[in-house]
Structures are given as C-alpha cells and as structure tokens.
Amino acid sequence: MPYYEDIMEYVERVKMKLKPKLLVIFGSIAKGGFGVGSDVDILIVSDMLPKNFQKRLKILFLLNDTFAPIEPVGYTSEEFKKMISKGHPTALDAIHDGIILYKDEKYEKEIRSLFKEVIGRVRREEFGWVKV
C-alpha cells in the first residue's frame, strides 16, 4: 500500500486524539486504482468529533503530520449509521470496498448488519450505487 508508514502514523494520532470506532481507507487506494495524483481517502467514525463541520475538518487535517496526501472525512457513529441506512455512496463504498485500519468490534458488527439490510435495496454499478 502506498504511504503505508505515513498512513499508520496518522491512524495512531487519530486513535490517541479521537478514540475512533472505525477507521477505513476507501476510494481508489482501496480499490487498487491508486496512481499519480491520487490521495488517500480515510473515513473516521468518532463521537469525539465537534458538531461544526469546519472545525471537524480542521482537526482531521491538523492530525496529519506526514507527507502523505491524506483526505480525511469524519462522522459520528450515529451520522455514519444514518448514512448507511440512507444508502449514501461514501458509506457504502467504505464498507463494501474499504480497508479497515481500526475498528471497535461491537460497532463494526452494527455497521455490517445495517449494510446487509441496505444492500438488498441497492445495486453497485460501474460509477456508483443505484436503488433497485
């Protein structure tokens, strides 16, 4: 995996600061399509994230002390559950194709259960998810 050491350094910083329930690499790197100019999309689920989205992004970006092009996105555990329930493409991609870097076992089971419910209502197409 490109930037492996940098990614793991970032993961450790996030774990110390935000006590996440889930950390997942998604996007091109998870699908094996990483190339020149690609970034490293990391989904972070933590109930310690601020409600304000701009403050949330600032914290997530400031935790990256590496040269890796990390593009973090962060959600609370309830926000992420709602995203899965509604068939949000980012959430579905992260669960379907993602590489789990860290997980709370109980939370991951909840997420997988929700995903199984939703996967019966959507279908994966070449460029995204569609309702069936």
Language-model features: where?
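Catalytic core of pol beta-like nucleotidyltransferases
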Residues: 1-22, 30-36, 47-132
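A short beta-strand element within the Helicase C-terminal
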Residues: 38-40
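Short hydrophobic/aromatic beta-strand micro-patches
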Residues: 43-45
